[in-house]
């Protein structure tokens, strides 16, 4: 009986194999049972992927535990993913930590590609992050940049950690435009800063073994990481629930009018449209998205930009010359001055090329697709190594050199249409907050170089400044 069953099984296997055409998969390094290629990924993820791609090609398939991952490492392949097959790769993969800490994907960044996502993203683009809305926050930006300059002046004769000052700047700006200035200080301010720091660290460095190898999911419980994530998620929700209730009370006492922060704007939209998708859970998810994305990536980008300027004295001299000529006789640089600063814009672009913070763009195939001749299965996660394409010597002249002049009179911009340069991503999932981030960064950098000259601590040289990166949510400066 068992022998007959064995023969039938072999026959069915061979018959089905003939019926199912073999797939043409992208090149892949050898893998081990269960863990796949996890053992080939080092702590510097972007460098590990670059080294593997140089051996196996710009489209490379890895198996990270149970997860098939397509690594994209060229501008041509990136264009295929983000333009030719943009809809197919319009999903974002969600880890167990993201699921807990970002409202189960009800936010903009991680929501599944659907009508809900389209409506929520449209609300963010047209109501929260439009050019007119970003401009309306100019007083907040100028006040917080003035506070930054004052804090640096108070410590000008001492060695200061400029990175911490820049983080404080972006945290204050984003807090004020998201939930209001009352969350900058006191108990609310401390709680806001604590939760922001905890969640940023968890999303960057909390890896669930169960995401990759479900059979080992018990390790996450044993280590306490799962319980810690769940505890923090509840604290975040309680904080946002409190902010939401405070805003509703303010609107009621002011007869429908509230502050012009993101939370108030979303509540007003819901009030005006009974059929809106903006229920309270959705509103909290969007506001938390704005806080996380606006603070973390903006501050990281700003720190890289300032470090790049300090490391390159010739660039600093040229930039100071431009900024100080345009701002001559003024006590500070204002936003109206920035449009005249072409070299400043080139410096910003070059910094975000060589030290790109969005170093890997995550996507997920929502259906089977043929990509550059290869068969990609539904559910395959995609990592676009923008760090590698921004340093590709076939696309950039002397790519390791920090040379802002390459962007003077260049058509390349931030909008995601040049696939060798994607500091804010591209396609349907491109970052909607480009104008918001650049408004903060340009004003801060212009005022810092306008007001101050920099020197390294005793015994150190500008060229010795460490510009290596540490992977997390973004690529952090070490």
Swiss-Prot record:
Which UniProt key words apply to this protein?
Endoplasmic reticulum, Heme, Iron, Membrane, Metal-binding, Microsome, Monooxygenase, Oxidoreductase, Transmembrane, Transmembrane helix
CDD domains under this entry?
CYP71-like (cd11072)
GO CC: one term? endoplasmic reticulum
What does the entry give for GO biological process?
Answer: coumarin biosynthetic process
Q: Temperature sensitivity?
A: Optimum temperature is 27-30 degrees Celsius.
Q: In which pathway does it act?
A: Secondary metabolite biosynthesis
Q: Where is this site: Substrate specificity?
A: 109, 293, 297
Q: Does the keyword Cell wall biogenesis/degradation apply?
A: no
InterPro entries the record matches: Cyt_P450 (IPR001128), Cyt_P450_CS (IPR017972), Cyt_P450_E_grp-I (IPR002401), Cyt_P450_sf (IPR036396)
Activity control mechanisms: Not inhibited by (+)-marmesin, psoralen, 5- or 8-methoxypsoralen and angelicin.
Reaction(s) catalysed by this chain's protein: (S)-columbianetin + reduced [NADPH--hemoprotein reductase] + O2 = angelicin + acetone + oxidized [NADPH--hemoprotein reductase] + 2 H2O + H(+)
Chain intervals for the UniProt region annotation (Substrate specificity): 357-361
What this protein is reported to do is described as: Involved in the biosynthesis of coumarins and furanocoumarins (FCs), natural products required for defense responses against attacks by predators with potential medical and agroindustrial usages such as anticoagulant, rodenticide and artificial vanilla substitutes. Involved in angular furanocumarin biosynthesis. Converts (+)-columbianetin to angelicin. Produces also some hydroxycolumbianetin as a by-product.
Say which family it is in. Belongs to the cytochrome P450 family.
What is the recorded name of this protein?
Angelicin synthase
Which species is this UniProt entry from?
Pastinaca sativa (Wild parsnip)
Q: What is the lineage of its organism?
A: Eukaryota, Viridiplantae, Streptophyta, Embryophyta, Tracheophyta
Per the record, the gene is CYP71AJ4
